[in-house]
């Protein structure tokens, strides 16, 4: 992570726990969006046994404001700080991402010790300048799958992937994903992808929302 505050796992945990994904989807977006349970979305991939990836993998998201504050307190203690400020970058021409960003601002600002600075820009500037140059702390982004395989999402977190703008890097994750590419047994490959997502989600390399 380029931001030393976000390099702290407890700070990342606080951010994820502060988001009420169910409330966001049902009462704010109201467009059929579903709360994310992990990095690979529901309805994308079916296992060799005919089961949805999301049903076989664990759920890695939850909303718990008290736990979020506790995680932030611990993170601040580890960092030796009483307060941190994070920039939240979003495109004003990207609906509903602008509404989503405001929701996040309110959620994060409710935590004592965390200040949010909103960085409003355009989609083009967000992708080709801010993200490409690493000029962000938190950024509201999305991904459209290229195919119905979990790797269309999982490869985004590889150390050398050009779309890994946050520069999260985990050697074990990279190793498992390398095995995914070469594994010929469909069931074994499926389990490797579940294992890889577990590493990514537990370390909060990305924070899936909806």
Name these PLM-found stretches.
Residues 26-30, 38-39, 100-101, 150-153:
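Short, solvent-exposed loop/turn and secondary-structure capping segments
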Residues 1-37, 83-95, 184-204:
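Alpha-helical secondary-structure segments
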Residues 8, 79-81, 131-134, 148, ...:
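Extracellular/periplasmic catalytic domains that process cell-envelope and extracellular macromolecules
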Residues 35-75, 94-98:
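Structural transition elements
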Residues 18-23, 28-32, 44, 72-79, ...:
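Sec/Tat-exported extracytoplasmic proteins
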Residues 10-13, 25-26, 59-61, 115-127, ...:
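Extracytoplasmic/peripheral linker and loop segments enriched in polar/acidic and small residues
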Residues 73-145:
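Ligand/substrate-recognition segments at binding pockets and active sites
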């Amino acid at each position: 992570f380029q931001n030393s505050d976000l390099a702290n796992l407890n700070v990342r945990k606080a951010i994820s726990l502060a988001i009420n994904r169910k409330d966001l989807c049902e009462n704010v977006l109201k467009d059929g969006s579903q709360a994310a349970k992990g990095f690979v979305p529901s309805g994308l991939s079916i296992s060799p046994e005919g089961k949805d990836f999301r049903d076989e993998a664990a759920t890695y998201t939850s909303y718990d404001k008290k736990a979020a504050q506790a995680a932030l307190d611990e993170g601040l203690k580890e960092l030796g700080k009483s307060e941190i400020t994070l920039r939240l970058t979003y495109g004003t021409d990207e609906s509903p991402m602008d509404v989503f960003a405001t929701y996040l601002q309110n959620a994060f600002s409710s935590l004592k010790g965390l200040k949010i600075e909103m960085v409003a820009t355009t989609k083009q500037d967000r992708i080709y300048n801010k993200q490409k140059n690493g000029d962000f702390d938190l950024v509201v982004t999305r991904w459209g799958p290229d195919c119905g395989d979990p790797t269309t999402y999982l490869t985004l977190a590889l150390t050398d992937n050009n779309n890994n703008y946050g520069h999260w890097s985990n050697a074990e994750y990279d190793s498992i994903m390398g095995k995914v590419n070469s594994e010929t047994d469909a069931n074994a490959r499926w389990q490797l992808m579940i294992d890889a997502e577990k590493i990514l989600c537990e370390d909060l390399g990305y924070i899936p929302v909806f």
